[in-house]
Structures are given as C-alpha cells and as structure tokens.
UniProtKB/Swiss-Prot annotation:
Protein name: Proteasome subunit alpha
Source lineage: Bacteria, Bacillati, Actinomycetota, Actinomycetes, Mycobacteriales
Family under the similarity heading: Belongs to the peptidase T1A family.
Gene this chain is encoded by: prcA
PROSITE patterns referenced in this protein's UniProt entry, alphabetically: PROTEASOME_ALPHA_2 (PS51475)
Pathway entry: Protein degradation; proteasomal Pup-dependent pathway
Main location: cytoplasm
Organism per entry: Mycobacterium bovis (strain ATCC BAA-935 / AF2122/97)
Length: 248
C-alpha cells in the first residue's frame, strides 16, 4: 500500500526560500545608496536592453536583482499602480513607502500561495519633492515579502556580503555624485573579486548601468547616466585631483 507524499508547511517554506535564494545568488549585484543630491543606483549589467534600474514615478525609483522576467513584471505593475493612483488622486499621493508596501504584499502572496516563489530582490527609493529637504528613503523588499527601510544603502544580488562590508567601511553621508559612484563601483569590484579568486575586475561604461534620483530636479527626478557622461564620472572618481561633480 502506498502512502501519499506529504511535506510539512515548514519544510515547504524552507524549500521555497532555498529556491529563491539560489536564484538571487546567481544574479549580478546591484547597489543603491544615498548621496548629497539624492539616490544613486549602480548595477553590474552589460545588457543595454534588459534594464535592472527604472523610474516608477516622479520622485520614486526602482532597482532589482534576480530573474528578469519576474522583476520586470513587478516593475510594470508598480508603474501602472502609481500612474493610476496619481491620476485618481494627486501626484504627491504616490510615495516610495506605498509602492514598497504594495510590492511586499504581492511578493508575500506569491511566496505563500503559488507553487514557485519569485527569485527576486527589490529596492524602492524616493527623494523629497523639489524644494523640500527630507532625506532620501530606501526600502528593500525580499522574495518572501519582507520589507526593511535602509538609512544609507541597499545591496542586492549574488555577492552581497563583501559589497556590504566594503560599503560599511567606505560609505560617506552627503558625498558628491562622483565620490558616491566611486564608492559604489569599488564595492562592486570587491564583490566580483570575492567570486573570481581575488582578481580585481574592470567595471566600466560597457558593464555598468547607472542612474540617479536627483532631488534638485523639478517634478521627475529620475535620470540615467550613460555614455560619455558616465565615462567622465568614472575618470573623475579615479583621479586624485577630482573635486567636482559631473552631470549628464
């Protein structure tokens, strides 16, 4: 006589967590950090079409690590939610905390009710409205719907520990854009070196996706930094004489 295969709820949750963590561990790393002008996003991403960083709404940005099709569905859903709420009420009613809570509820439901969890980790960031002085807000949302607000930076992807350790040592509040980019790139290199046996990889324009939420811009704060503008920032942060901030 055969017995039906039974898995306890605790074991099912453990297996789902392990599946999600393994998927995220294969992803390239993403860093989001607060700087003097807002929030900087830096991702290891050689693809120009499959983007990990995006605008969600006027003052809100999004970054993710994990399976692209899964976090892209979440990104598009977040944009639709924000547009609908901003149209029905007021644009200022759309906040980073609100969107982070929506993502947390969605991922929590998927984790507990669907056969397979999403293999994703998200960051939602918000800067103050133009003319206000409120500090940036950073929220981390994990595959099971857990949410945490981070005061300074968020690290996501496969090699978070060496990157987070590097940021803890080098992060400076109110850094310029050039300095913040240098801190983020150096931390990403520390993570890549940890997985490649100590060799320091080259992270340049072709292998980085960079964007900012610029609190000094009216209305739409999101801005991508690409091409020559990114190259100039990378050159500046490598130069000991660098004392200014480039724009792009």
């Amino acid at each position: 006589m055969s017995f039906p295969y039974f898995i306890s709820p605790e074991q099912a949750m453990r297996e789902r967590s392990e599946l999600a963590r393994k998927g995220i561990a294969r992803a390239k790393s993403v860093v989001a950090l607060a700087y003097a002008g807002g929030v900087l996003f830096v991702a290891e991403n050689p693809s120009r079409s499959l983007q990990k960083i995006s605008e969600l709404y006027d003052r809100v940005g999004f970054a993710a690590a994990g399976k692209f099709n899964e976090f892209d569905n979440l990104r598009r859903g977040g944009i639709q939610f924000a547009d609908t709420r901003g149209y029905a009420y007021d644009r200022r009613d759309v906040t980073g905390r609100q969107l982070a809570n929506v993502y947390a509820q969605t991922l929590g439901t998927i984790f507990t009710e669907q056969a397979k969890p999403y293999e994703v980790e998200l960051c939602v960031a918000e800067v103050a409205h133009y003319g206000e002085t409120k500090p940036p807000e950073l929220y981390r949302i994990t595959y099971d719907g857990s949410i945490a607000d981070e005061p300074h930076f968020v690290v996501m992807g496969g090699t978070t520990e060496p990157i987070a350790n590097a940021l803890k040592e080098s992060y400076a509040e109110n850094a310029s854009l050039t300095d913040a980019l240098g801190i983020a790139v150096a931390a990403l290199r520390a993570g890549s070196a940890d997985t490649s046996g100590g060799d320091q990889p080259t992270l340049g324009v072709a292998s980085l996706e960079v964007a900012v939420l610029d609190a000094n811009r009216p209305r739409r704060a999101f801005r991508r930094i690409t091409g020559s503008a990114l190259q100039a920032l990378l050159v500046d942060q490598e130069s000991p004489q660098s004392d200014g901030e480039s724009s792009g």
